[in-house]
Regions:
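Conserved active-site "lid/cap" helical segment
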Residues: 1-62, 66-74, 78-81, 160-172, ...
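Flexible glycine-/small-residue-enriched beta->alpha junction loops
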Residues: 2, 100, 110-163
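Active-site pocket-lining segment
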Residues: 54, 159-162, 198, 208, ...
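Active-site-proximal alpha-helical scaffold in enzymes
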Residues: 87-117, 165-194, 258-265, 330-331, ...
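Condensing-enzyme catalytic core mediating Claisen C-C bond formation in acyl metabolism
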Residues: 1-25, 227-293, 297, 304, ...
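Conserved catalytic cysteine-centered active-site region
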Residues: 56-110, 151-157, 225-251, 332-360, ...
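N-terminal extracellular/periplasmic Venus flytrap/periplasmic-binding protein-like
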Residues: 12-13, 23-24, 28, 32, ...
Length: 396
């Protein structure tokens, strides 16, 4: 009989805006903050963890196995192994899935999973300089953001969003209205303190002007003044006559998330109160040209494995890479929008890619508790057409 796997600690950092509060913070320090907080909330010592499975997508300049650095700095002893997961945007949810599988196989008793990202510290690259040298002529400085271009299709995620708009007939004004509502929901949730339970404040390093170090406790990218009429004035970014803009797409950012997993039996032995149990998960891959429709494939597969339907889900968290992507999946799945991203999504909060998959699980757990739900599903798509989905049940 497969053991039941539960989460006993789940947390995220605030989401810093691109070039914002975390601009100069190394990615492993963000990861360490989330890891230390998850251990503390779970009541687990770092030495009790058997494995750390942690994600980081934008790894240029972050050293070998950057999650190992984050783990040790976050209180995990040196003898505990760590590996870094990269599955594009679903990476940290995949890390949770791998942790779940490791526990179910009896290979570990406690696993820490999650992910981190610092988009603000992504470097510029001088490719081929090692071999071509600098004797004469110009050289091109390449932004490591070029890694977001999918070689399978030859363009970035923004064009895949434009493809979705065309495929599903989603107009610009519908995207702008959705984006404005995402910001409005996030602002209300922040103002009402609904996000506080899932966030662990981060203290920045001391500076001359702030010798104690500033404490960052709130998400930075939420724009309270956002309205569809304002968004309508923005120009398309990815296609001359397109509909996807900086306003109806997710923003870049920095942050980390972490979840402590164990078996129900071991949680009982520890005297730890489970937050949620994992019911089922799934991963799928679709045409990279329309990568954003992945949740429409992964969610039904996870539901089938759980023997449940979408109507059984009290709440749904789908990462908002683009407003059009959520609307496309809504057309495909026919979900009740009032259940989706009720505290706002990545269009408002930001999308630090390596941490978002676990972040939406942390958020879903918080939403289920805040609004007295029992079951929820989370899903996230990624470059190359990969997608993950996970169903969780709130523990009472």
């Amino acid at each position: 009989v497969r053991p039941e796997i539960v989460a006993i600690g789940a947390v995220r950092t605030p989401l810093g805006s691109f070039g914002g509060a975390f601009r100069d913070v190394p990615v492993w320090d963000l990861g360490a903050a989330a890891i230390a907080a998850a251990l503390r909330r779970a009541g687990v010592a770092g030495g009790d963890v058997d494995d750390v499975i942690y994600a980081n997508c934008r790894q240029a300049g972050n050293g070998p196995n950057p999650s190992r650095t984050a783990a040790v700095k976050g209180g995990i002893p040196v003898p505990v192994p760590t590996h870094t997961v990269n599955m594009a945007c679903p990476s940290s949810m995949k890390a949770v899935m791998l942790g779940w599988q490791s526990l179910a196989l009896g290979e570990a008793r406690i696993v820490l999973a999650g992910g981190m990202e610092s988009m603000s510290t992504m470097p510029f690259l001088l490719k081929n300089a090692r071999w071509e040298g600098f004797k004469l002529g110009d050289r091109t400085l390449t932004d490591s953001w070029s890694d977001t271009i999918d070689p399978l299709v030859g363009y970035g995620m923004g064009m895949t969003a434009e493809n979705l708009a065309e495929k599903y007939g989603i107009a610009r004004d519908e995207q702008d209205r959705f984006a404005a509502e995402s910001h409005a929901k996030a602002a209300r949730a922040q103002d009402d303190g609904l996000l506080d339970a899932e966030i662990e404040p981060v203290r920045l390093p001391p500076t001359r002007s702030d010798p104690d170090g500033r404490v960052v406790a709130r998400d930075e990218s939420i724009r309270r003044e956002t309205a569809a009429a304002k968004l309508a004035k923005l120009k398309p970014v990815f296609k001359k006559d397109g509909s996807v803009t900086a306003g109806n797409a997710c923003s870049m950012g920095d942050g980390a998330s972490a979840i402590v997993l164990t078996t129900r039996e071991h949680a009982s032995a520890l005297g730890a109160k489970p937050l949620f149990s994992i019911v089922a998960s799934a991963q799928t891959a679709v045409d990279p040209a329309v990568m954003g429709e992945g949740p429409a494939h992964a969610i039904p597969r996870a539901l089938e494995r759980a023997g449940m339907t979408l109507r059984d889900m009290d709440f749904i968290e789908v990462n908002e890479a683009f407003a059009v992507q959520i609307l496309a999946n809504e057309r495909a799945l026919g979900w009740d929008r009032s259940k989706v991203n009720v505290h706002g999504g990545a269009v408002a909060l930001g999308h630090p890619t390596g941490m978002s998959g676990a972040r939406i699980l942390v958020t879903l757990d918080n939403v289920l508790r805040r609004h007295d739900g029992e079951h929820g599903v989370a899903s996230i798509c990624g470059g190359g057409g990969v997608t993950t989905a996970m169903i969780i049940r709130r523990e009472r």
